[in-house]
Amino acid sequence: GIPCGESCVYIPCLTSAIGCSCKSKVCYRN
């Protein structure tokens, strides 16, 4: 539920390396 400061509209979350995932076009962590 914490925004990772990255969008995932056109590309996947690069922050997935630290546990972020794409939700509603924005990368979130927990």
Curated annotation (Swiss-Prot):
<keyword id="KW-0960">Knottin</keyword>
<dbReference type="InterPro" id="IPR036146">
    <property type="entry name" value="Cyclotide_sf"/>
</dbReference>
<feature type="cross-link" description="Cyclopeptide (Gly-Asn)">
    <location>
        <begin position="1"/>
        <end position="30"/>
    </location>
</feature>
<protein>
    <recommendedName>
        <fullName>Cycloviolacin-H1</fullName>
    </recommendedName>
</protein>
<dbReference type="GO" id="GO:0006952">
    <property type="term" value="P:defense response"/>
</dbReference>
<feature type="disulfide bond">
    <location>
        <begin position="8"/>
        <end position="22"/>
    </location>
</feature>
<dbReference type="InterPro" id="IPR005535">
    <property type="entry name" value="Cyclotide"/>
</dbReference>
<comment type="function">
    <text>Probably participates in a plant defense mechanism.</text>
</comment>
<feature type="disulfide bond">
    <location>
        <begin position="13"/>
        <end position="27"/>
    </location>
</feature>
<dbReference type="InterPro" id="IPR012323">
    <property type="entry name" value="Cyclotide_bracelet_CS"/>
</dbReference>
<dbReference type="Pfam" id="PF03784">
    <property type="entry name" value="Cyclotide"/>
</dbReference>
<keyword id="KW-1015">Disulfide bond</keyword>
<feature type="disulfide bond">
    <location>
        <begin position="4"/>
        <end position="20"/>
    </location>
</feature>
<comment type="similarity">
    <text>Belongs to the cyclotide family. Bracelet subfamily.</text>
</comment>
<keyword id="KW-0611">Plant defense</keyword>
